[in-house]
A protein has these predicted regions:
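Conserved GTPase G-domain substructure that encodes guanine base recognition and part of the catalytic core
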Residues: 1-88, 93, 98-282
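Small-residue-enriched transmembrane alpha-helices
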Residues: 278-327
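Extended, hydrophobic alpha-helical membrane-active domains that insert into or remodel lipid bilayers
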Residues: 330-331
Length: 331
């Protein structure tokens, strides 16, 4: 029987318990860890029918452990809820299938965005708007952003909305996509840049917000066989982590899809994997390790990474995170 996978919180707890820190400092760190562990991330995905919300969710997160449910009132809610313990995904129905249906969906989106969590803050931390990069008619999505999301989120809209341009592989009807290397050629790459530039300008014109769209491909399968691997998913994940509160970033670590192929291809404009690790480290430092004694050695070797390699202040706790992130996204 295989050993049950430990959560990032359990690994961090073990690191602290096995450290040479004074007992009082251990207790303080464990208390802080309990606070961090209680934080839950809520992400909402919205978009037109066929934009690829479900494929994006499945590509990014480990949905095998998701508990499927609905909103507070199962009788009336049409927004699907996927509960992955510290991460909750709210998947809204696709827009564009009828005026009355769209009104019903937007009404529920507004209601959900107005909900408050137990801490009195907005329940939804982030809204990811998925657009179809191959579509010339994005009017429904612009209406959603301009007339629903921005008014509902108010002054926090710019930091709580991410725009994803999915289906980059078929943006030019399947042309100029290098299947062997799983990336666009220069022609398609320029097309996608212009598409993103156009969407960005249109949103800024309508709302005043400067939101940079991320072109990506969630990947897909047909008849059980994979037809296209994900592309630029690392860039989208990095954007999500950057835009959720720092104290909640650890919640994503346990729920990242473990298929390394999903994180193997991107535009290489930045090292998104390394940037993601740094953002997670910031979260660990902010939430747990303020004031750690220089030279404290937490954990010795965990997941094959010596604590002192990272440095005395962060020690093996960050080593834990390094190991987990590397095992998921690759070195």
């Amino acid at each position: 029987m295989s050993e049950e996978k430990k959560t990032i919180y359990e690994l961090l707890e073990a690191d602290i318990m096995n450290s040479n820190l004074p007992e009082a400092e251990k207790a303080a760190k464990l208390s802080r860890l309990i606070q961090v562990r209680s934080k839950q991330v809520n992400i909402m995905l919205v978009g037109a029918t066929g934009s690829g919300k479900s494929s994006t969710i499945n590509a990014m997160f480990d949905m095998n452990v998701a508990k499927v449910g609905v909103g507070v009132d199962p009788e009336t809610s049409i927004i699907s809820k996927f509960d992955l313990d510290n991460l909750v995904i709210w998947d809204t129905p696709g827009l564009g299938d009828g005026v009355e249906r769209d009104k019903e969906i937007t009404r529920e989106i507004i209601e959900k965005l107005s909900e408050l969590g137990e801490d009195g803050k907005p329940l939804i931390d982030l809204v990811v708007v998925i657009l179809d990069s191959s579509s010339k008619d994005l009017g429904t999505s612009y209406e959603l952003i301009n007339n629903v999301l921005v008014p509902a989120l108010g002054s926090e809209a710019e930091k709580r909305i991410i725009i994803g341009l999915n289906q980059a592989d078929v943006a030019m009807k399947g042309k100029h996509w290098n299947k062997e290397e799983n990336k666009p050629d220069d022609v398609l790459k320029n097309f996608l840049k212009e598409k993103a530039k156009s969407v960005r300008a249109r949103i800024k014109e309508g709302t005043g917000l400067d939101l940079e769209p991320i072109c990506y491909c969630a990947g897909y399968s047909e008849d059980g066989e994979e037809q296209c691997k994900p592309y630029n998913l690392t860039k989208l994940l990095h954007a999500i982590i950057q835009n959720i509160p720092r104290e909640k970033r650890l919640a994503l670590v346990d729920n990242i899809n473990t298929d390394k192929d999903n994180w193997s291809y991107d535009d290489e404009e930045e090292d998104y994997k390394e940037d993601t690790k740094k953002d997670i480290f910031d979260s660990v430092f902010d939430c747990m390790l303020e004031g750690a004694e220089a030279g404290s050695e937490l954990g010795g070797k965990l997941l094959g990474i010596p604590g002192r390699i990272i440095g005395g202040v962060l020690g093996g706790v960050v080593g834990s995170v390094v190991g987990v992130i590397d095992s998921l996204l690759g070195d």
